[in-house]
């Protein structure tokens, strides 16, 4: 099985774009025209366009680009989602970044959102190995971000997206200026068995043929009270995201599979290796949530300390999904990103 760091996964040349970057395009190959779901309180950002890509291993990804109108912009944010998310969940964030002068490119990871599912049971979150996510990111960078979006490029990643960004860091050195990782999935919060134990159990189950089985029964509808959920303290954004999931359930997932869990644990454990940490070469700010009960804040802070180009800060009392949090937390995150990205205004191409 390929690991996240294997050179065999460096395959940018294999991506094929399926459509033009224009709202007026017509698909000539019979491919479904990409669409986005709008609900009350979650409008699609102005200037957002979308399309599909096919990766080198023949998986279809849905992507979106939202460049800044006008003659000047501050570069492009490559926005990386967490597990069980979709482009629509970030409409508000895309609009906020546009208002600050940044263009945005984002996409749905394989197996979730509007991208191709990997199992017949489409509600299960599944990958065979972590390197598949690196294929997705490389494809979008080479086929959308670099040719169609303005430099400089910055990564803004949440949770699982942060873990992927870290493993892609050595490949992004010559293209990405800086990365801001929000509550990255580097370790699980307290109360979860150790990564070593989970790794042994998940690997054993996978080798016994249970890789495509769910880790647990779906609990997507169990938490109904915004005050008690682990993701956000903001009632309005919580309700908006629930409405989105109810309106477009095909975009979202239930349980991850055993193979997904095994791949994540292997990727997290690699980041405890000194050689892996030494290869993290893009300047990176890790932002942790003070009230996070999903991922380990301490593990993320220790990684930042060990990185030669890393730093960290904490948003006190914020829950795991900081871009879905109350304004008093969310605005801090946006200000931090803005300051870390710096004054990188460039003239946009005419």
Regions found by a protein language model. Give the residues of each.
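Acidic catalytic loop of the alpha/beta-hydrolase fold
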Residues: 291-295
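An N-terminal hydrophobic leader/cap segment in hydrolases
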Residues: 21-54, 60-69
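Conserved alpha/beta-hydrolase
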Residues: 96-119
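Alpha/beta-hydrolase active-site loop
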Residues: 125-145
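Short alpha-helix in the alpha/beta-hydrolase fold that links the catalytic acid
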Residues: 282, 296-305
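Short beta-strand/loop motif that positions the catalytic acidic residue
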Residues: 280, 286-288
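Alpha/beta-hydrolase-fold enzymes
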Residues: 160, 165-252
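Catalytic active-site module of serine/aspartate enzymes centered on a nucleophile-bearing elbow/loop
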Residues: 316-350
């Amino acid at each position: 099985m390929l690991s996240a760091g294997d050179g065999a996964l460096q395959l940018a040349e294999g991506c094929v774009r399926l459509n033009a970057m224009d709202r007026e395009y017509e698909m000539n190959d019979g491919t479904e025209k990409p669409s986005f779901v709008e609900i009350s309180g979650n409008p699609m950002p102005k200037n957002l366009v979308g399309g599909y890509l096919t990766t080198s291993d023949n998986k279809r990804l849905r992507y979106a680009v939202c460049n800044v109108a006008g003659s000047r912009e501050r570069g492009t944010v490559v926005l990386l989602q967490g597990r069980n998310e979709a482009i629509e969940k970030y409409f508000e964030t895309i609009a906020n970044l546009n208002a600050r002068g940044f263009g945005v490119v984002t996409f749905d990871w394989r197996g979730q959102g509007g991208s191709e599912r990997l199992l017949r049971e489409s509600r299960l979150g599944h990958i065979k190995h972590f390197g598949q996510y690196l294929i997705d990111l490389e494809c979008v960078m080479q086929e959308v971000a670099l040719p169609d979006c303005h430099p400089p490029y910055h990564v803004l990643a949440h949770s699982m997206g942060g873990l992927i960004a870290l493993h892609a860091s050595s490949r992004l050195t010559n293209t990405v200026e800086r990365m801001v990782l929000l509550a990255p999935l580097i370790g699980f919060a307290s109360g979860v068995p150790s990564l070593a134990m989970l790794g042994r159990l998940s690997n054993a189950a996978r080798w016994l043929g249970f890789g495509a089985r769910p880790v647990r029964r779906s609990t997507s509808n169990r938490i109904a009270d915004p005050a008690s959920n682990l993701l956000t303290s903001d009632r309005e954004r919580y309700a908006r995201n629930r409405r989105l999931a109810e309106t477009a359930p095909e975009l979202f997932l239930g349980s991850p599979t055993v193979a997904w869990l095994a791949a994540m644990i292997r990727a997290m454990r690699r980041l405890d290796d000194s050689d892996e940490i030494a290869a993290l070469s893009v300047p990176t700010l890790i932002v942790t949530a003070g009230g996070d009960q999903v991922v380990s804040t301490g593990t993320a802070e220790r990684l930042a300390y060990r990185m030669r180009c890393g730093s960290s800060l904490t948003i006190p009392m914020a829950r795991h999904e900081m871009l879905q949090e109350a304004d008093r937390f969310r605005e801090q995150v946006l200000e931090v990103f803005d300051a870390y990205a710096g004054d990188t205004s460039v003239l946009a191409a005419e």
